[in-house]
Protein backbone atom coordinates (compact mmCIF):
# COMPACT_ATOMS: atom_id res chain seq x y z
CA UNK A 1 0.00 0.00 0.00
CA UNK A 2 1.23 3.49 -0.80
CA UNK A 3 1.80 5.57 2.33
CA UNK A 4 -0.64 8.46 2.71
CA UNK A 5 -1.42 11.24 5.19
CA UNK A 6 -4.46 9.26 6.35
CA UNK A 7 -2.45 6.17 7.30
CA UNK A 8 -1.60 5.31 10.87
CA UNK A 9 1.47 3.14 10.65
CA UNK A 10 1.44 0.08 12.87
CA UNK A 11 4.46 -0.85 15.01
CA UNK A 12 7.64 -1.65 13.10
CA UNK A 13 11.22 -2.51 14.01
CA UNK A 14 13.70 -3.78 11.42
CA UNK A 15 16.64 -3.70 13.81
CA UNK A 16 18.09 -0.54 12.23
CA UNK A 17 17.21 2.68 14.03
CA UNK A 18 17.92 4.83 10.96
CA UNK A 19 15.42 2.87 8.85
CA UNK A 20 12.84 2.80 11.64
CA UNK A 21 13.13 6.57 12.09
CA UNK A 22 12.86 7.16 8.36
CA UNK A 23 9.57 5.26 8.17
CA UNK A 24 7.95 7.03 11.12
CA UNK A 25 9.53 10.50 10.87
CA UNK A 26 10.67 11.20 7.31
CA UNK A 27 8.88 9.04 4.74
CA UNK A 28 5.70 11.09 4.53
CA UNK A 29 7.60 14.39 4.42
CA UNK A 30 9.81 13.11 1.58
CA UNK A 31 6.70 11.95 -0.23
CA UNK A 32 4.87 15.26 0.22
CA UNK A 33 7.93 17.04 -1.20
CA UNK A 34 7.84 14.63 -4.20
CA UNK A 35 11.29 13.25 -3.37
CA UNK A 36 10.29 9.62 -2.91
CA UNK A 37 7.27 7.37 -2.51
CA UNK A 38 6.98 4.84 0.30
CA UNK A 39 5.02 1.60 0.18
CA UNK A 40 4.33 -0.72 3.08
CA UNK A 41 2.63 -3.98 4.02
CA UNK A 42 1.01 -4.70 7.37
CA UNK A 43 -0.98 -7.58 8.83
CA UNK A 44 -3.39 -5.54 10.95
CA UNK A 45 -1.19 -5.75 14.05
CA UNK A 46 2.21 -4.57 12.84
CA UNK A 47 4.03 -3.33 9.77
CA UNK A 48 5.79 -6.22 8.05
CA UNK A 49 7.90 -4.27 5.54
CA UNK A 50 8.35 -1.01 3.72
CA UNK A 51 10.34 0.39 0.83
CA UNK A 52 10.84 3.83 -0.68
CA UNK A 53 11.48 4.56 -4.34
CA UNK A 54 12.72 7.63 -6.18
CA UNK A 55 13.93 8.49 -9.65
CA UNK A 56 17.62 8.04 -10.34
CA UNK A 57 20.08 7.67 -13.18
CA UNK A 58 23.34 5.97 -13.95
CA UNK A 59 25.50 8.83 -15.20
CA UNK A 60 28.87 8.87 -16.94
CA UNK A 61 30.17 11.70 -14.79
CA UNK A 62 29.75 9.61 -11.62
CA UNK A 63 31.50 6.48 -12.90
CA UNK A 64 34.93 5.34 -14.00
CA UNK A 65 35.52 5.30 -17.76
CA UNK A 66 35.85 1.52 -17.76
CA UNK A 67 32.53 0.93 -16.05
CA UNK A 68 30.78 3.52 -18.23
CA UNK A 69 32.04 1.68 -21.34
CA UNK A 70 30.54 -1.51 -19.90
CA UNK A 71 27.18 0.20 -19.41
CA UNK A 72 27.23 1.65 -22.95
CA UNK A 73 27.78 -1.83 -24.44
CA UNK A 74 24.33 -2.74 -23.12
CA UNK A 75 22.88 -0.34 -25.69
CA UNK A 76 24.28 -1.34 -29.10
CA UNK A 77 23.22 0.73 -32.11
CA UNK A 78 21.80 3.56 -30.01
CA UNK A 79 22.74 7.20 -29.84
CA UNK A 80 25.30 7.72 -27.05
CA UNK A 81 23.89 9.21 -23.86
CA UNK A 82 25.48 10.73 -20.79
CA UNK A 83 23.07 8.92 -18.46
CA UNK A 84 20.44 6.18 -18.39
CA UNK A 85 17.20 6.19 -16.36
CA UNK A 86 16.87 4.21 -13.16
CA UNK A 87 14.72 3.92 -10.07
CA UNK A 88 16.46 3.98 -6.69
CA UNK A 89 15.46 1.87 -3.73
CA UNK A 90 16.21 4.55 -1.17
CA UNK A 91 15.06 2.61 1.87
CA UNK A 92 14.02 -1.00 2.42
CA UNK A 93 13.19 -2.57 5.75
CA UNK A 94 11.69 -5.85 6.95
CA UNK A 95 10.36 -6.25 10.49
CA UNK A 96 12.78 -8.35 12.59
CA UNK A 97 9.97 -10.85 13.24
CA UNK A 98 9.87 -11.59 9.51
CA UNK A 99 13.58 -11.64 8.75
CA UNK A 100 15.48 -14.87 8.06
CA UNK A 101 12.37 -16.89 7.26
CA UNK A 102 12.09 -19.53 4.56
CA UNK A 103 10.21 -16.97 2.44
CA UNK A 104 12.49 -13.94 2.18
CA UNK A 105 10.37 -10.81 2.42
CA UNK A 106 13.34 -8.75 1.23
CA UNK A 107 13.65 -10.86 -1.93
CA UNK A 108 9.88 -10.58 -2.35
CA UNK A 109 10.16 -6.77 -2.34
CA UNK A 110 13.03 -6.78 -4.86
CA UNK A 111 11.22 -9.17 -7.21
CA UNK A 112 8.05 -7.11 -6.90
CA UNK A 113 9.86 -3.87 -7.75
CA UNK A 114 11.70 -5.53 -10.66
CA UNK A 115 8.46 -6.83 -12.21
CA UNK A 116 6.62 -3.61 -11.48
CA UNK A 117 9.24 -1.47 -13.22
CA UNK A 118 9.08 -3.69 -16.31
CA UNK A 119 5.29 -4.13 -16.57
CA UNK A 120 3.63 -1.14 -14.88
CA UNK A 121 6.19 1.65 -15.00
CA UNK A 122 4.89 4.95 -16.35
CA UNK A 123 8.30 6.18 -17.56
CA UNK A 124 11.43 4.66 -19.06
CA UNK A 125 13.54 2.83 -16.52
CA UNK A 126 16.37 0.46 -17.40
CA UNK A 127 18.05 -0.02 -14.02
CA UNK A 128 17.30 -0.33 -10.33
CA UNK A 129 19.94 1.25 -8.12
CA UNK A 130 20.64 1.05 -4.43
CA UNK A 131 23.21 2.40 -2.03
CA UNK A 132 23.40 -0.82 -0.02
CA UNK A 133 24.53 -0.90 3.58
CA UNK A 134 27.77 -2.92 3.78
CA UNK A 135 25.94 -5.63 5.75
CA UNK A 136 23.22 -5.90 3.05
CA UNK A 137 25.58 -6.32 0.07
CA UNK A 138 25.43 -10.18 0.15
CA UNK A 139 21.60 -9.97 0.06
CA UNK A 140 21.66 -7.73 -3.02
CA UNK A 141 24.29 -9.88 -4.75
CA UNK A 142 22.13 -12.95 -4.11
CA UNK A 143 19.24 -11.10 -5.78
CA UNK A 144 21.12 -10.27 -8.98
CA UNK A 145 22.51 -6.82 -8.20
CA UNK A 146 26.04 -5.96 -9.27
CA UNK A 147 28.61 -3.50 -8.00
CA UNK A 148 28.54 -0.19 -9.85
CA UNK A 149 32.12 -0.62 -10.96
CA UNK A 150 35.27 -2.16 -9.55
CA UNK A 151 35.79 0.74 -7.12
CA UNK A 152 32.52 -0.20 -5.38
CA UNK A 153 33.62 -3.84 -5.13
CA UNK A 154 36.86 -2.64 -3.49
CA UNK A 155 34.87 -0.40 -1.10
CA UNK A 156 32.91 -3.48 -0.06
CA UNK A 157 35.91 -5.80 0.22
CA UNK A 158 37.83 -3.25 2.30
CA UNK A 159 34.70 -2.22 4.24
CA UNK A 160 35.21 1.44 3.31
CA UNK A 161 32.20 3.69 3.80
CA UNK A 162 28.74 2.90 5.09
CA UNK A 163 27.20 2.07 1.71
CA UNK A 164 28.10 0.51 -1.63
CA UNK A 165 26.54 1.59 -4.96
CA UNK A 166 24.90 -1.33 -6.76
CA UNK A 167 22.56 -1.80 -9.72
CA UNK A 168 20.27 -4.32 -11.40
CA UNK A 169 19.70 -4.32 -15.17
CA UNK A 170 15.98 -4.85 -15.78
CA UNK A 171 16.69 -6.37 -19.21
CA UNK A 172 17.69 -9.52 -17.31
CA UNK A 173 14.00 -10.25 -16.71
CA UNK A 174 12.48 -9.00 -19.98
Description of each model-found segment:
Residues 100-115:
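Conserved acetyl-CoA-binding loop-helix of GNAT-fold acetyltransferases
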Residues 52-91, 157:
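Conserved acyl-donor/pantetheine-binding loop and adjacent beta-alpha core of acyl/acetyltransferases
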Residues 34-52, 65:
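Conserved beta-hairpin
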